[in-house]
Amino acid sequence: MRLITTTNPDNGMAMIGRYPLLPYRPAPEAVRAWLQRPPGGYVVADSELGWTVAPGGRTPDGLYQANAEGARAPADRSYGERSLPGRLRLVTVGDSFTHGDGVGLEDTWQRELERRRADLEVVNLGVPGYGTDQAYLRWRRDGARLNPHFALLGIWPEDICRNLNVVRFFLQPAGGFGFLSKPRFIRADDRLQTLNLPVLEGEPLVRALIDPLNSPLLRHDYWAIPNDLELHSWQHLRVARAFATVANLYRRRELRQRLYAGTDPAGIEVTVAIAEAFARDVRRKGAVPVVVLIPMLDLLQRYAEENSLPLAQALRARKLDVIDLGPPMARLVHERGPSSCFAADSHLSPEGNRWLAGWLLDRLAPWLDAARGQPGG
């Protein structure tokens, strides 16, 4: 068994495959070294949002670039406070499926919307790895000032899990966001209360990671599971840790399934509350809020029918305008296979982005046409 375990050079933790072994308690020097790494050129830490797209940022390979407003767009494109005459402006916020991970700018669904309707100006404020909480906060800070006609909140079902998380490491120990922390909303007296704002950084974050059981903030992190963090006498045996870690991965997968299904209502409840707050804010700006549910490959078969996704049901029960793109994609995948829409990493392929844009435009068209007939539309 020792032969199949390794040590991660980035965080000093023992690994089985790409997964850290229990307990999920990184060494303080590993956390400090990670935090002291040079900032990236595209996605950067942000005290209000956890992380964001850097204004004017660019990845080394040039696949992703941002304008001065932090939107995914050519560096020389500026949106300003108002749309161009005769254009309807849509601002889109969400996670990597809104951002367009894995595809170039011209292959994002936002650019496809603009190609299909010349009267649209679609601003891409998606950020890789976001929860719905971060997307809402990005709307408030960066999207509202663009004064759109429509604001689209993209939600991928995994965001239900992210919305219960504070430090990404505990949700995704093997993930690509290291030890970054993020804001978290909780429901208190039928209102949303914001936690971890500004977000944990520096030594306070180090202390939370190395002694998580004594961190008051992490009591609100669904994924900082005490049994995963506790030190046990048997853990000096790496083989025992490896077996325990594999079993724990299956338990965590079951927790996710319960959240998607609403059997554990915590994730859907806070996600719906965030979407309601988003809709209220958008309406106060004089714009139309729309929630767009972006399909998750692993759930397509289970929730293939119209209004079968529990999150969609809960959002509609609160009278929110919802466009669920899961059913049309489920039909397409059933007919043509996953490769018709999805890349190897389960993000949308260029073709998947085009399909999504077409379905989305069909459902948006009545609202868009009505807005065109209004003064200023």
What is each model feature region?
Residues 95, 135, 151, 282, ...:
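Generic structural signal for small/hydrophobic residues in well-ordered secondary structure
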Residues 132, 136, 268, 272, ...:
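Short, amphipathic alpha-helical "lid/cap" segments that border enzyme active or binding sites
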Residues 5-117, 139, 223-256, 309, ...:
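Membrane/wall-proximal cationic-aromatic binding patches
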Residues 157-315, 320, 325-338:
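Serine-dependent acyl-ester chemistry module
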Residues 76-77, 135-143, 273-276, 307-308:
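Alpha-helical scaffolding within the catalytic cores
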